[in-house]
Regions:
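N-terminal subdomain of nucleotide-sugar transferases
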Residues: 1-60
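Carbohydrate-associated surface elements
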Residues: 37, 177, 196-199
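Membrane-proximal helix-turn-helix segments that form the acceptor-binding/catalytic region
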Residues: 114, 121-126, 152-171
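Acidic donor-binding loop of glycosyltransferase active sites
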Residues: 169, 273, 289-306, 321
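Acidic anion/phosphate-binding donor-loop and adjacent secondary structure
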Residues: 183-187, 191-195, 199-215, 230
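Conserved donor-binding/catalytic core segment of Leloir-type glycosyltransferases
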Residues: 212-229, 235-238, 250
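Nucleotide-activated donor-binding/catalytic signature segment of Leloir-type glycosyltransferases, i.e.
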Residues: 250-252, 259-286
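A short, well-ordered alpha-helix in the C-terminal region of glycosyltransferases
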Residues: 351-354, 358, 365-379
Length: 400
């Protein structure tokens, strides 16, 4: 197949879409990418991408077209300008760039959903089907930004979100609770939706990340550090163990709340047990699993975003790590169904702290959690299963 991918985020920023594009190419498909400028990791555009540089590149055989965008920087105003600039530049590119022959458009939709607007323009121009992979649900995500339901801004975003989703020929959701939300809130037909959970590299299944017991307990968090990850809950739980000499919490990753997270740890007086490492490339980040007894997972439960099945959960499971989380929805269900660890309700910092203590006190009780995690992963979240399902769906859409 010839696939045109539209994603505001792409390499050299670290996102799953990088792997998706690479793997599709390895599986024999011809891939073209329309994206913006890489600024997610640092919030600023790197020098090598300024002033019109590197607007056309090749990534693992895929032709990449980059459109100019305003840097994210910090704060909601700059972030909104960043989002809008991709829509404007992407729509302009849809009109002016000749993308050649392709069979289908694939949108990798994390926030904001507006990144799909250039894809809609391309759909209309080339008369090709539009497939959207939904990992964030809108307008629910704007609640996490502080906009309340019923306000003028929320109602406008709600109408725009519904319009975007309804323009898609098919929507694959990464979490099952998204079915009801998209149907009830955005007016999408259940018939044009399917379930496609995220995947993690199956290579991790063969690696031995097991840490030998040494009397010290190391808990690891790897991934994005943003508002929806409910970092205040995680920090509050970690701080409750600050007087212990046998515990260390390791935080690997970056994001909009990274600086705030470090400030909260300092304010809580927990700097002695919490270590921050910043964002790391995927391969380097994987090495941190070797120091971990268990991995940590939190997600904001104040709205439906908390129903998400976070991609980092699959990665934790592929690494064979026990998982200790404060999460609702699909994530909570998977942890309990797979028996890969301990889970309390989202936002329950006391419960999360007690879960850490429970694991420390009865580590032998959870000795099989890592293998249980990998077993569940093999049955549900492998790369091969993801791409077989994706390819079948795309071919079906092309042949309709």
């Amino acid at each position: 197949m010839k696939i045109l991918v539209v994603s505001e985020n792409f390499y050299p920023d670290t996102f799953a879409i990088n792997d998706i594009v690479r793997i599709l190419g390895e599986r024999g498909h011809e891939v073209t990418v329309l994206t913006g400028l890489p600024d997610y990791t640092t919030s600023y555009i790197p020098e090598e991408y300024k002033h019109g540089k590197n607007r056309e590149q090749v990534y693992h055989g895929a032709k990449v077209y980059r459109v100019p965008t305003i840097a994210r920087r910090h704060g909601p105003i700059w972030r909104s300008l960043n989002y809008l600039s991709f829509v404007f530049s992407g729509n302009r590119a849809a009109k002016k760039i000749d993308f050649g022959e392709f069979d289908i458009i694939y949108v990798w939709e994390v926030s904001p959903v507006t990144m799909a607007l250039p894809a809609i323009a391309l759909k209309k121009k080339y008369k090709k089907p539009l497939f959207l992979y939904c990992m964030d649900i809108w307008p629910e995500c704007v609640k996490a930004m502080g906009f309340k339901e019923g306000t003028f801004f929320y109602s406008k975003i709600k109408n725009l979100s519904a319009h975007i989703y309804q323009q898609c020929d098919h929507i694959a959701v990464s979490s099952k609770p998204f079915f009801d939300y998209l149907e009830k809130v955005d007016g999408c037909s259940r018939k044009k939706m399917s379930y496609l959970p995220q995947f993690a590299s199956s290579d991790m299944l063969e690696k031995n990340f097991e840490k030998k017991p040494n009397g010290h307990f190391d808990f690891l968090y790897i991934g994005n550090i943003g508002k929806v990850q409910d970092i205040p809950c995680l920090v509050a739980a970690m701080a409750k163990l600050k007087d212990r000499k046998d515990v260390t919490f390791h935080i690997v990753g970056g994001g909009s709340e990274y600086e705030h997270a470090m400030a909260m740890v300092k304010e809580a007086g927990a700097e002695n047990i919490v270590k921050f490492y910043g964002p790391k490339p995927f391969k380097e980040a994987m090495t941190y699993y070797k120091i971990a007894d268990a991995c940590m997972l939190t997600l904001d439960g104040k709205n439906r975003i908390g129903d998400t099945l976070p991609g980092k959960l699959q990665t934790y499971m592929a690494a064979g790590e026990p998982v200790i989380g404060a999460i609702n929805g699909a994530g909570n269900e998977v942890i309990k169904e797979s028996r890969c660890g301990l889970s309390v309700r989202a936002g329950d910092s006391d419960g999360l702290a007690n879960a850490f203590l429970e694991y420390i006190a009865h580590q032998e009780k959870y000795a099989n959690c890592g293998e249980a995690a990998r077993k569940y992963f093999r049955e549900n979240f492998t790369q091969e299963k993801h791409f077989e399902t994706l390819e079948a769906r795309l071919k079906e859409m092309i042949n309709q």
